[in-house]
């Protein structure tokens, strides 16, 4: 940690080359909130009623878990759902009733949960994935084999997006986040028929 003492108060900062170390400690702390953060976002996917609404919630939570699997360590699918429900039970004891009533009741439930963790916990990762997606769209078709070039392009684009205030977290402009986003893209492309 560097300390700047020349101003009216001390400012503590990480050296520019300490990004991976900081990410390790940050992710260690975020790990305590990640399941609840995923629950917050998964609640937004509910549009049906009854058991179908619960299925939508679970499926979205599992989809998000899969999307962040290179950032965090998760339990297996069944154990994750049990943990997800337990975490939500702690914050909103009657959540199942609200979810089964559909989208409107679920949004009302979400508005009453404090603190909401999804946006603050997951924003840097989602913004990084969006920057990488934009960088991919800017590449000529068939020319994404050079990952280092793509990551450098995403870093430049990310810096631009921060300066334009189109993304909120400077932390999102991260080579390691972009590397993980590329892994997700490659997995997704393998699932598309005729590729």
Language-model features: locations:
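Membrane-interfacial terminal anchoring regions of lipid-handling membrane enzymes
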Residues: 1-195
